[in-house]
Amino acid sequence: MGIRGMLRAAVILLLIRTWLAEGNYPSPIPKFHFEFSSAVPEVVLNLFNCKNCANEAVVQKILDRVLSRYDVRLRPNFGGAPVPVRISIYVTSIEQISEMNMDYTITMFFHQTWKDSRLAYYETTLNLTLDYRMHEKLWVPDCYFLNSKDAFVHDVTVENRVFQLHPDGTVRYGIRLTTTAACSLDLHKFPMDKQACNLVVESYGYTVEDIILFWDDNGNAIHMTEELHIPQFTFLGRTITSKEVYFYTGSYIRLILKFQVQREVNSYLVQVYWPTVLTTITSWISFWMNYDSSAARVTIGLTSMLILTTIDSHLRDKLPNISCIKAIDIYILVCLFFVFLSLLEYVYINYLFYSRGPRRQPRRHRRPRRVIARYRYQQVVVGNVQDGLINVEDGVSSLPITPAQAPLASPESLGSLTSTSEQAQLATSESLSPLTSLSGQAPLATGESLSDLPSTSEQARHSYGVRFNGFQADDSIIPTEIRNRVEAHGHGVTHDHEDSNESLSSDERHGHGPSGKPMLHHGEKGVQEAGWDLDDNNDKSDCLAIKEQFKCDTNSTWGLNDDELMAHGQEKDSSSESEDSCPPSPGCSFTEGFSFDLFNPDYVPKVDKWSRFLFPLAFGLFNIVYWVYHMY
C-alpha cells in the first residue's frame, strides 16, 4: 500500500471525527460507524473517539457552544419543575462564641449542587473546573444565611469561588466564606452552661415552586475538620434539620444546622471560684481572734467584701447586661452573704462584750459599794455620837457626891459655848433621818438652859476632857478645839465612784451623806451633848435609842432595791442606768427576759465557738448542692 492509500485512510478518519463532533446537529451527510475488532486496545479507541480530550481547544469550544445561547437571568428548567439544590458544608473553624455580643464566628466551605441541562456537553467525559470569573456568566441559587450579622468571601490570593461542570449539566458551586451569626445564649447556668448555636440557610427570592433546598448525601452533608477547637468551649455534636416556612410571598425551604457546645469551667474555677472561696474562708479567721480585737476583725471582714465585689465587677464587664440571674452570680452573692454574716457575728458579740460585759460590770459593782459607803457613813456618825455619850457618862460617874463642891460655870465659858453652837450649823430632822429619835429626846443646849445649871457647869467641862485634855483651866480653848474637830471630820465619809479608793462625790463633799442627808459634824454633836440631861437613866436610854435607830437604818440601807441605789448616781449614770427603770409591767418583764436571753454576755465565747463549726458546715453544704445541681 503506497502513499495514496495512507492519504485516503487519513481523510476517512477526519471525516469520521467531524461527523462525531457534529452529532447533535442534523446533517445530510450519512454517518458511518466503524467496528474494530476486540484486539484493538482501548487506548487506541479513546484516541479515535477523543472522550478524554480536554485540551484548550476542546474546552473553549464547549464553553463557546453552551454559553452562546445561555441566559443567566433564568433558572434551569424555567417554567417547569422546581430545581433541586443540594447543600453541604465543610467547617474549618469556629473562632469565637461571644457572650457579650450573643454571636459566634464560623469559617466554612459552602457547596451548592444543581443540574442545568443547558450546560451539558458531549465532547469529553471529563469534568470541567472553572474559576470565579464564571460566577457572572452562570445562574446560581440565591441562598443566604438567615441569622448572619456579617459575612465575606475570602479573596486571598484570588476570590475563593469554584465551579465544576459535569457532562450531564450538573453544576457544583463552592465558596469559602466567614460569617458572624447570631446565637441566643442561655446564661442561667453560666459558666456550667451548654449552648446550641444555629446556622440557617434559606433561598432569598425563589419559593418552593422554583427551588427546593435539601441537605446533601442523606444527612452526611456536614463535615468538620479534625483539628476543630472552640475557645472556652468543647464541641459536643451537630444536628441538621429542614422545614418549610410561610411568608406572604410564598413558601420557602429552610435548612438548619445546629452546633452543641459546652463551656469549659476550668478557667472560671481558677479565675473566679477559687479566689471567691479563699476570700470567704479568710473572713472566718476572725472567729479565732480575740473578741476585743475590733480593728483586726473589722478589717478582715471589710477587705473580704471588697475583694468579692471587685471579682464580681470584673466578671460583669465580660457579660452582657441581661436580666437573668446567672449561677456564678448566686455563688458570689452567697459568699458575700457569708462574709457579711461574719461581720454581723462580730457586731453581735461586740455589743455583748462592751455593752453587757466589762462596761456593765463597774456599774453593777457600784451598787454594793454605795451600800458599803452608806453603812460607813452611818457607822461614823453613830460611832461619834456614842463616843460623846460615853464621855458624858464617864463625866457624870466621876462627879463628886456633893454638888456644892463643883464650881459654877463662868459667864465667859457659857458665852464660848453659845458662840460655838451658833457657828456650827444644826442638823435638822429632815436631813438627819437616822437620828430623829435622838434629836427629839435631847434638845439643844441654849444659853438659858446652861445658866440654870448651878452645880454642873464644871461637870460639863469634865465631860469634854477626853476631847481636849489639858485645857480645863482655859475655857476659851474649847470652841477652837471643837471647830478643829469639825474641820477634821468634815471629810471623813467617802463615796465610791468607779473604785472604792476614789474621792467623795459632790454631795458628800458638801456635808451630805450618800442619800443626800446632811452629815452630823462633831461640832454639832458637841453642842447637843452640852444640852443633854446628865441623869444616868436618860443617858442609857438615849444610847439604846441611838443603837436601835442605827440597826433600823442599817437594815433599811441593805434592803434598798437597785433602783433606789442607782438613783444616787443618776447624774453620772442616767444614760446607762435608764434600762433598769422600766416599770414592772408584764410587757416590760417579757421584753427584759427576751433581751437578757438574746444579749446574754455569757454567749460571747460561745458564739465564736459555734461560728467556727457552723459557717464551714453551711458553706460546704451549699457547695455540694450547687455543684451537683449545675453539673448533673
From Swiss-Prot:
Gene3D superfamilies: Neurotransmitter-gated ion-channel ligand-binding domain, Neurotransmitter-gated ion-channel transmembrane domain. The chain crosses the membrane at residues 269-289, 298-315, 327-347, 612-632. Residues 491-511 have a biased composition (Basic and acidic residues). Residues 1-21 form the signal peptide. InterPro entries: GABAA/Glycine_rcpt, GABAAt_rcpt, Neur_chan_lig-bd, Neur_chan_lig-bd_sf, Neur_channel, Neuro-gated_channel_TM_sf, Neuro_actylchol_rec, Neurotrans-gated_channel_TM. Its main location: membrane. It is found in: Postsynaptic cell membrane; Cell membrane. Residues 410-458, 491-523 are annotated as: Disordered. It catalyses: chloride(in) = chloride(out). GO terms for molecular function: GABA-A receptor activity; GABA-gated chloride ion channel activity; neurotransmitter transmembrane transporter activity; transmembrane signaling receptor activity. It holds the Pfam family Neur_chan_LBD. Disulfide bonds join 183-197. Potentiated by etomidate, propofol, pregnanolone and pentobarbital. Residues 413-425, 448-458 have a biased composition (Polar residues). Expressed in brain. Keywords: Cell membrane, Chloride, Chloride channel, Disulfide bond, Glycoprotein, Ion channel, Ion transport, Membrane, Postsynaptic cell membrane, Signal, Synapse, Transmembrane, Transmembrane helix, Transport. It is a multi-pass membrane protein. Residues 426-439 have a biased composition (Low complexity). One of its GO terms (cellular component) is receptor complex. Theta subunit of the heteropentameric ligand-gated chloride channel gated by gamma-aminobutyric acid (GABA), a major inhibitory neurotransmitter in the brain. GABA-gated chloride channels, also named GABA(A) receptors (GABAAR), consist of five subunits arranged around a central pore and contain GABA active binding site(s) located at the alpha and beta subunit interfaces. When activated by GABA, GABAARs selectively allow the flow of chloride anions across the cell membrane down their electrochemical gradient. This is Gamma-aminobutyric acid receptor subunit theta. It comes from Homo sapiens.
